[in-house]
Regions:
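Membrane-interface alpha helices of multi-pass inner-membrane proteins
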Residues: 3, 112-128, 139, 164-166
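Extracytoplasmic catalytic/substrate-binding loops of multi-pass membrane glycan-assembly enzymes
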Residues: 6-19, 27-32, 179
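Transmembrane-helix motifs of polytopic, lipid-linked glycan transferases
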Residues: 35-56, 93-94, 98
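Membrane-interface transmembrane helices that cradle and orient dolichyl/undecaprenyl
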Residues: 53-56, 95-115, 225-229
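Short helix- or helix-capping micro-motifs
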Residues: 62-73, 120, 124
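Short acidic/glycine- and proline-prone juxtamembrane loop motifs at membrane-interface regions
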Residues: 77-88
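Transmembrane-lumen/periplasm boundary regions of multi-pass, lipid-linked membrane glycan transferases
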Residues: 122, 134-235
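Transmembrane alpha-helix segments characteristic
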Residues: 232-247
Length: 247
């Protein structure tokens, strides 16, 4: 977090910003950064619990949702190290939560749009791949407004976009002044110039295999926990539609 700037060669600035805050408070104490990481993880769990509570109207199912999430490798084994992946977790959850509030309510409020824009910007400034979630959210609202017409377009939706862009401006200026070094670093890491056609088949398969292995504890927990509850799944359920798009 030393030498804070609006960007760095490898990642956007938010994870460094929070690290610097803890350094100013606690100094070079290792335990402080382990604590920082767990604060972010627990915050994500709290938001997920709140979201699940609004979705299921059941505190038990909300707790089960958090327990299942805890069973995923990236929410337990890798969390002692505070990095960009941990940094984005609460903002990912908060974006989903405020998207749900806008999706579920009949009335679009300034507050919900404003906070969605804020958390979307902070999440993106934690890690660029956060954009995948934001694209999913945009596709969801495009679908329900312009295709299915479940909801009417409201210009207040644009508040979230405006807030998002305004908060990104300093980082975009920094990128321009530094020859887009963060983006070029990410592209260089892909190894596209030295890869063969076969690599585009083999490595994705290896990646999928690793992800399947990582999710084994989650699947085991799901089997024992979810079978105790009865669910009625309807393809016309708007809650299911929301979850499909977001995931």
């Amino acid at each position: 977090g030393s030498n804070l700037d609006w960007g760095f060669n490898k990642h956007p600035p938010v994870s460094a910003f929070f690290s610097e805050i803890f350094f100013q408070i606690f100094g070079a104490q290792d335990w402080a950064y382990y604590l920082l990481s767990q604060i972010f993880v627990v915050t994500a769990f709290i938001v997920v619990f709140k979201f699940a509570e609004e979705l299921f109207k059941d505190k038990t199912l909300s707790l089960v949702s958090v327990l299942l999430l805890e069973g995923i490798y990236f929410y337990n084994f890798t969390t002692p190290e505070f990095n960009v992946n941990v940094c984005q977790l609460p903002f990912w959850a908060l974006c989903v939560y405020y998207s749900w509030k806008l999706f579920d309510k009949q009335q679009v409020t300034f507050k919900d749009c404003f906070w969605l824009g804020v958390f979307a910007a902070i999440g993106f400034l934690s890690k660029y791949l956060f954009i995948y979630l934001l694209i999913a959210i945009d596709l969801l609202f495009f679908y329900v407004i312009f295709i299915k017409k479940y909801k009417k377009f409201d210009f207040k939706y644009l508040i979230s976009l405006e807030v998002f862009i305004v908060l990104l401006v300093p980082h975009l200026i920094w990128l321009t002044n530094n020859d887009y070094i963060t983006i070029t670093y990410g592209l260089a890491r892909t190894g596209l110039e030295n890869s063969s056609f076969l690599d585009h088949i083999v490595y994705p398969l290896i990646f999928l295999g690793k992800q399947a292995g990582i999710l084994i504890p989650f699947f085991i927990m799901s089997f024992f926990l979810i079978k105790k509850f009865k669910f009625k799944i309807s393809l016309k359920d708007k809650k299911l539609l929301f979850l499909i798009f977001i995931n």
